[in-house]
Amino acid sequence: VQPNVKIYVEDLNPCGRKVILFLHGWPGSHKLFEYQFDQLSKMGYRCIGIDTRGFGYSDKPYDGYNYNRLSDDVRCVVNELGIKNFILAGHSTGGAIAIRYMARHKGHGVAKLALFAAAAPSLIKRPNFPYGSNKEDIINIIQGTYLDRPKMLRDFGDIFFFQHTTQPFSEWFLQLGFQAAGWATAEIAKMWIEEVLFNDLEEIRVPTLIIHGIHDKVVPFQLGEVQNQCIKNSRLVPFIFSGHGSFYDQKDDFNMELMRFIEE
């Protein structure tokens, strides 16, 4: 995507009849969507997962952690694979990157958009925006990253899901965060403070599915409601037994909702 910067892409079932391009959230990797790749590929879908720069198996440069560059990375992958009429699906920060892609790249190649607890239009509360997290909480994440990243990641994992997760699952989730670079982990958190996507939402023209857990402690449910109001052709589906990780909290419902939306 840039000189000396390679992005890792998982391309499962490349002969599938419809393409879903997944953008993961912070601080994980494409592996967060394991339970979607497992089932949706069997249903005939081509599932493509990108590891954001700095995370998963992608290269970990010291810069490029802003919505413009991250959406440009996605465009590079779309161009390289030559995919068209695909479903762009983003969770949390990945949802925010998807929204910037729709605005900055005019939704190039995208037939439909799916947002899961997207960190938009602003993850933090602002003078004219009363929803979202407190800025202090994000500053604590940044400081925690530089002070004791394993503990910060453990604390974050503890609020991620609403349903009970087993100890082995929690350890697996933690390992995904360990794959990221510390500097990338902090830079993305800084981006939440420095960047907003209010204007981007207005530019989305494609049918959009919004799945948001009502118990989300990371990206409050109200942000999903704001997205629903701002995106013209959108539908909000509240997940009443989910926190931030609806793709695992209610994985069967999640997969069914996503397939129904794709086939509409």
Residue ranges and their predicted role:
Residues 8-63:
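Conserved HGGG/HGGXW glycine-rich cap/lid loop of the alpha/beta-hydrolase fold
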Residues 99-104, 108-147:
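Flexible "cap/lid" loop of the alpha/beta hydrolase fold
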Residues 124, 128-133, 143-203:
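Conserved alpha/beta-hydrolase catalytic His-Asp/Glu region
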Residues 204, 210-212, 216:
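Short beta-strand/loop motif that positions the catalytic acidic residue
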Residues 217-223:
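Conserved alpha/beta-hydrolase "acid-adjacent" motif
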